[in-house]
Design a protein with these regions (language model features):
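Extended, charge-rich alpha-helical interface modules
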Residues: 1-75
């Protein structure tokens, strides 16, 4: 995998994680209730699932596509 593709995917997954964290924080701190999403715990669960999938993808990228261990620590 070339470096640009690797970094693009990594940023994509990291952005997904940040987005989910922000949404969960907003749900819990601001008590936001969206009419279509009355099930707050269900929404939080879906967001956690999305985060877990993104973290798994980051782990796979690092495991199989990082060239050396020094580079893995930087990323």
């Amino acid at each position: 995998m070339n470096d640009m593709l690797f970094r693009t995917l990594l940023k994509r997954y990291e952005a997904t994680i940040e987005d989910c964290m922000y949404k969960i924080q907003s749900l819990s701190e601001n008590n936001i209730i969206i009419p279509e999403h009355v099930d707050i715990t269900g929404e939080a669960d879906k967001l956690l699932q999305t985060m877990a999938e993104a973290e798994d993808k980051v782990a796979v990228l690092r495991k199989y596509y990082v060239k050396n261990k020094a580079e893995a620590k930087i990323l």
